[in-house]
């Protein structure tokens, strides 16, 4: 036993960090293997599944690509979807090609692989080698690869939203002006992919104002978990102006098009469908929600908050919200709703790229809590620094998106809405756990953390090998 513990102590630095030249080489090789595997698996799936262009999202994106053929900038919207992905498809492919839809899916797989490479660098800059590799693999297998087999904006949006969250969290504790510029650019690009970035951006602005007021009122007299020496109140207003200027400069062509077409720069049909009772009503009655059109409808038929509460009472609203939240929690953490290890039938085509995707999140969160307990027992939590505002922003974001997507279930039941949170949640629990392990300075923390991540590595590697050996899919479930 003593020799085993010595061996574990010897290999721990190579797997948990700090990074060494050999660790970097091994990590790069592993990421290249992962990206190559994603290419093989993803292209096989696109060749086997999803050959019918549906009349809604995928069909609409195809139509948007044709409209933006030859465009110098992503400016066009159909009132529901944003233009970044169809614009890229129009630039990199020929929208008039009979195989445009199939090639567009292949392009999306390629974008998912590029996103995986970007995510690998992101995690490598924040956690140790093993945790970074597991995080990268989970992002790709659980989120990026499944949705990339469709013709849609999600792969681009998911990785951009992760970077937006990371940049915003950092800006709550240190605020150099270039970081505000970066946030404005990233948020604008994410919004051009999908407008789902907007609630988080608003929350960030609110928490930034809280940080500003705290700094002006208390200065360095705040407790350790709020004190942020790298955050300067004098930079806030200038940084905010830089951020907003970059944001609106990038999305301006899209806003101009919307204003000319529908009379409102931020016209967006899903914001009206949010208050509808079901998808059929959206299709049949709410295809046009311009103000002049809504004015012709009785109040109780309008897709607005006022219209909803003319049709329903508070009890109905609470039932809808509660039921929707339960649906979204199941979709995020345990979509299979089966507790056996294998959810697939032998000799049958697959439907899931990574089974039990949410249980990995739960396991990593539990591991982070264990690391927190060890660090607290050592009296070293203060070494974490100013964590309160980033943690509160994270929790608020989770609750807001959970309730918003839960409310939206009757009109938008797809998994992709709640999967917006998967990669940011993964980043938070992994980086939090790694930092807590490091500050604890305890051998026990290293042993437990190493054991947990080695177990995850074995599970993920076995799944990749299994998919390489047998990539027969009849459809992709729990993604779109």
Predicted features and spans:
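Membrane-interface anchor segments at the N-terminal boundary of transmembrane helices
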Residues: 23-26, 99-110, 310-395, 422-423
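Extracytoplasmic catalytic/substrate-binding loops of multi-pass membrane glycan-assembly enzymes
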Residues: 47-62, 75-88, 98-102, 262-269
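Short acidic/glycine- and proline-prone juxtamembrane loop motifs at membrane-interface regions
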Residues: 81, 149-157
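Transmembrane-helix motifs of polytopic, lipid-linked glycan transferases
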Residues: 106-127, 159, 163, 167, ...
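Transmembrane-helix signature of polytopic, membrane-embedded enzymes
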Residues: 119-142, 158-159, 174-178, 182
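Membrane-interface transmembrane helices that cradle and orient dolichyl/undecaprenyl
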Residues: 125-127, 164-179, 190, 212-219, ...
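Membrane-interface alpha helices of multi-pass inner-membrane proteins
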Residues: 135, 167, 179-195, 201, ...
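Membrane-lumen/periplasm interface segments of specific transmembrane helices
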Residues: 236-364, 462-470
């Amino acid at each position: 036993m003593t020799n085993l513990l010595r061996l574990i102590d010897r290999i721990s630095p190579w797997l948990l960090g700090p990074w060494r030249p050999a660790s970097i080489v091994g990590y790069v090789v592993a990421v290249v293997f992962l990206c190559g595997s994603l290419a093989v698996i993803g292209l096989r799936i696109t060749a086997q599944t999803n050959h019918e262009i549906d009349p809604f999202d995928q069909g609409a994106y195809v139509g948007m690509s044709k409209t933006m053929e030859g465009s110098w900038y992503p400016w066009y919207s159909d009132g529901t979807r944003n233009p970044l992905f169809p614009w890229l498809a129009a630039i990199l492919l020929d929208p008039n090609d009979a195989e445009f839809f199939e090639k567009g899916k292949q392009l999306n797989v390629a974008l998912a692989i590029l996103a995986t490479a970007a995510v690998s660098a992101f995690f490598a800059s924040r956690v140790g080698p093993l945790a970074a590799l597991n995080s990268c693999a989970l992002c790709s297998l659980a989120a990026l690869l499944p949705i990339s087999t469709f013709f849609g904006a999600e792969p681009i949006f998911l990785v951009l939203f992760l970077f937006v969250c990371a940049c915003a969290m950092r800006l709550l504790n240190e605020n150099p002006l270039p970081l505000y510029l970066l946030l404005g650019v990233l948020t604008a690009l994410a919004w051009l992919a999908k407008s789902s970035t907007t609630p988080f951006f608003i929350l960030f602005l609110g928490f930034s104002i809280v940080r500003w007021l705290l700094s002006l009122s208390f200065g360095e007299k705040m407790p350790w978990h709020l004190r942020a020496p790298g955050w300067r109140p004098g930079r806030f207003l200038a940084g905010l102006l830089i951020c907003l200027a970059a944001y609106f400069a990038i999305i301006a062509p899209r806003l101009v098009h919307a204003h000319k077409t529908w009379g409102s720069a931020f016209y967006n049909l899903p914001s009206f469908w949010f208050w509808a009772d079901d998808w059929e009503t959206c299709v049949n009655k709410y295809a046009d929600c311009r103000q002049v059109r809504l004015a012709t409808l009785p109040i109780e038929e309008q897709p607005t908050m006022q219209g909803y509460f003319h049709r329903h009472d508070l009890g109905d609203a609470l039932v809808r919200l509660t039921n929707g939240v339960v649906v979204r929690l199941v979709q995020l953490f345990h979509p299979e709703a089966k507790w056996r290890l294998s959810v697939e039938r032998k000799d049958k085509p697959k439907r899931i790229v990574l089974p039990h995707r949410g249980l990995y999140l739960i396991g990593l969160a539990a591991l982070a809590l264990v690391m927190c307990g060890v660090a607290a027992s050592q009296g070293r939590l203060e070494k974490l620094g100013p964590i309160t505002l980033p943690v509160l922003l994270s929790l608020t974001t989770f609750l807001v998106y959970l309730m918003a997507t839960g409310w939206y279930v009757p009109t938008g039941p797809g998994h992709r809405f709640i999967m917006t949170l998967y990669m940011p949640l993964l980043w938070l629990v992994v980086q939090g756990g790694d930092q807590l392990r490091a500050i604890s300075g305890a051998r026990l923390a290293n042993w437990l953390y190493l054991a947990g991540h080695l177990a995850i590595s074995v599970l993920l590697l076995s799944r990749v090998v299994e998919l390489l050996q047998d990539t027969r899919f009849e459809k992709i479930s729990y993604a779109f």
